[in-house]
Design a protein with these regions (language model features):
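Extended alpha-helical targeting/anchoring segments
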Residues: 1-239
Length: 239
């Protein structure tokens, strides 16, 4: 297995082609959604700064997940590796592994890289915060997948692009990506839904009203000026 000491920053080449006569982005994602860590950043806006583009990332070459200081690195073709470090430092290291030295004016701004999320609890690594949250979901606090295969759609021009990052053999890499996009989506069995009655909240009505009362008291005392009072809903999904 390759050690982190052996991994150097790799300058990647970018190959881009316009996809013609392709389905809409949700239909493209249907063909990829069953693959682990497929990601769809969807926007229907045409405003350039607020949502002009939609992106699909698939078949990532690296996935970084963290819980506390425990970091797990999965690499395509290289298996899993674990480190213990500050999760934000791990994320920075992952971002620096591959670099793109090319500029492509007029094309979508994201053509390869990381998509993921950072939980609110990661704020503990930026400032001293109390750890009062109940940890009962078992989800990573940080999860980022890094993609060298991106489908990008420009809602303003209506053009869709396939972009791949590679070190060599662009024809092979592009053809592999095309084949993945051409596969028929798996058949899913339809269901009748879950029904409203199956949703459960972590607040009772009385508990919620009491929380609202406390928020008002904090505001009146000058301790806060607003609050994001949330509740969590759970529902059992059918297979």
């Amino acid at each position: 297995m390759t050690s982190f000491e052996q991994i150097e920053r790799t300058a990647m080449r970018l190959e881009i082609e316009e996809l013609r006569d392709t389905p809409a982005m949700p239909d493209i994602f249907d063909r990829l959604a069953h693959k682990p860590y497929s990601c769809f950043l969807d926007s229907s806006l045409t405003m350039e700064r607020l949502g002009r583009y939609s992106f699909i990332g698939f078949n990532p070459h690296l996935v970084l997940t963290t819980r506390g200081l425990d970091c797990s690195w999965w690499r395509r073709g290289g298996g899993m590796q674990a480190t213990r470090e500050n999760p934000l430092s791990a994320l920075r290291r992952a971002l620096e592994e591959r670099v793109i030295n090319e500029q492509h004016p007029g094309l979508p701004p994201f053509l390869g890289g990381g998509m993921g999320y950072m939980a609110y609890e990661l704020g503990r690594y930026l400032e001293r915060l109390p750890g009062n949250a109940v940890v009962d979901l078992g989800m990573p606090e940080l999860c980022f997948a890094f993609y060298d295969r991106i489908v990008a759609h420009d809602h303003e021009t209506g053009k869709t692009y396939l972009a791949v990052l590679h070190c060599d053999d662009p024809g092979r890499v592009l053809e592999e990506a095309r084949r993945e996009l051409a596969k028929r989506p798996p058949e899913y069995l339809g269901g009748s839904g879950t029904g409203e009655s199956n949703f459960r909240s972590n607040f009772s009505r009385d508990q919620y009203m009491e929380a609202v009362k406390k928020v008002k008291e904090y505001i009146y005392a000058g301790d806060i000026y607003q609050a994001n009072l949330t509740q969590r809903f759970e529902v059992e999904l059918r297979e």
